[in-house]
Amino acid sequence: MAKEFGRADRVAQQIQREIAVILQREVKDPRVGMVTVSDVELTRDLQHAKIFVTFFLNEVDDIEAGVKVLNDASGYIRILMGKAMKLRVVPEIRFVYDKTLVEGMRISNLVTNTVRDDQLRRGESPDQNEEDRD
């Protein structure tokens, strides 16, 4: 039976957990604010990790500043990660803003608006369909 997840996948999951804890407890820079680690992509040789993060900020400038702060602190974060994990080589890390949540919400709003507009064109009340389903 083949392994469902390779070593790189398992290490990436562990890195995600460790980085989340480090960002929560150790990184005190106010420019970072509330940050969530949404995913980690790790090369097969475990040398480089791309850390996808989301912020509870809406301003593009604040998000860019947060990513820059994280990338500037990546050496310190890497040292802390190396102490927490038992790896022969601790991967180089790079932080990237994860746009999937924002894009998903935007697409969801587009679909909702399109359905509502379609119902209004047909003369139906958008709330009427909700009542019919109950």
Swiss-Prot record:
UniProt entry tagged with the keyword Cytoplasm: yes
GO molecular function: ribosomal small subunit binding
Major localisation: cytoplasm
Cellular location(s): Cytoplasm
Signal peptide: none
GO biological process: maturation of SSU-rRNA
This protein's GO CC annotations: cytosol
Cited Gene3D superfamilies: 3.30.300.20
Pfam families: RBFA
Keyword annotations from UniProtKB, A to Z: Cytoplasm, Ribosome biogenesis
Claim: Transferase is one of the keywords in the record: no
Task performed by this protein: One of several proteins that assist in the late maturation steps of the functional core of the 30S ribosomal subunit. Associates with free 30S ribosomal subunits (but not with 30S subunits that are part of 70S ribosomes or polysomes). Required for efficient processing of 16S rRNA. May interact with the 5'-terminal helix region of 16S rRNA.
Family: Belongs to the RbfA family.
Quaternary structure and interacting proteins, as annotated: Monomer. Binds 30S ribosomal subunits, but not 50S ribosomal subunits or 70S ribosomes.
Protein name from the UniProt record: Ribosome-binding factor A
Organism of derivation: Tolumonas auensis (strain DSM 9187 / NBRC 110442 / TA 4)
Taxonomic lineage of the native organism: Bacteria, Pseudomonadati, Pseudomonadota, Gammaproteobacteria, Aeromonadales
